[in-house]
Regions:
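Glycine-rich loop(s) and the adjacent beta-strand/alpha-helix scaffold that form part
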Residues: 191-219
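Generic hydrophobic/aromatic pocket-lining and core-packing "Φ" positions
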Residues: 26, 103, 216-217
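Generic start-of-chain signal for non-secretory N-termini
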Residues: 1-13, 20
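N-terminal Rossmann-like FAD-binding beta1-loop-alpha1 element of flavoenzymes
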Residues: 13-40
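Residue-level preference for nonpolar/small residues embedded in alpha-helices
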Residues: 21, 98, 137, 212-215
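Core beta-strand elements of the Rossmann-like FAD/NAD(P) dinucleotide-binding domain
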Residues: 8-11, 181-191
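Conserved N-terminal/central alpha/beta ligand/cofactor-binding core
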Residues: 4-5, 36-37, 42-172, 177-183, ...
């Protein structure tokens, strides 16, 4: 049996998670911190991990401001109506005003986009979505993260965040293990970005489990 090792790493920015959010965070961290040491840690492999691992057939939101198709105010109005007023309009507006530039960046990186041959505009499916050939979506974004981060650790499952002993209520790193070798990894960082998946089940459940019961005890 191979001896399990403990591996130590120090960095300025530690990104936990290598899905679309994590790879994007690594890219943005490099953009704003040219001289920082950036490490991204992913439990699978960033080339095909996260919710977009298999690709997408559309980008769900694109304003089309350069063609005056929609404006951020339009999207805020849509979200407000859809959610019956329970919405942070400032956050919705902030996301909407940045989405076009992000899509253009994907286009520059080589994501195949469907266009109208006459006008050059992206083809839409409904008011907000634009159509793409998205099988290569995640590998394209992962490549940008590889160029941005100093190190990418695949197959490392982060289990706990570390608290900074010198500063109260401040995270100072994370620990996890390699799912192939069993080695234990300790990451110390000045900043930790947790991009480990969507935030669901953070509320008090009210379901009584009827659906699950019907599944397991079908007639």
């Amino acid at each position: 049996m191979a001896k399990i090792k403990t591996v130590y790493e120090k960095c300025d920015v530690l990104v936990v998670g290598g899905g679309m959010a994590g790879t994007g965070a690594a890219f943005e961290a490099r953009h704003w911190g040219r001289d920082l040491k950036i490490i991204c840690v992913e439990k699978a492999n960033i080339d095909r991990s996260g919710a977009v691992a298999q690709g997408l057939y559309a980008i769900n939101c694109y304003m089309g401001m350069q063609w005056d198709e929609n404006q951020p105010e339009d999207h805020v109005r849509y979200a407000r109506n859809d959610l019956m007023g329970i919405v942070r309009e400032d956050l919705g507006y902030d996301m909407a005003r940045h989405v076009d530039s992000t899509v253009h960046m994907f286009d520059e990186w080589g994501l195949p986009m469907m266009r109208n041959e006459k006008t050059g505009r992206y083809l839409r499916e409904g008011k907000w979505q634009i159509m793409i050939h998205g099988e290569s979506y995640k590998p394209i974004v992962a490549e940008a993260a590889k160029k941005s981060a100093d190190k990418i650790y695949n197959r490392i499952m982060i289990t706990h965040l570390l608290m900074d002993e010198s500063k109260e209520n401040r995270v100072g790193g994370a620990v996890g293990f390699n799912m192939r070798t069993g080695n234990f990894h300790v990451f110390r960082a000045k900043a930790v970005i947790v991009a480990a998946g969507g935030a669901s089940h953070i509320f008090k459940p009210r379901a009584v489990g009827e659906g699950m019961g019907r599944t397991w005890y079908a007639p």
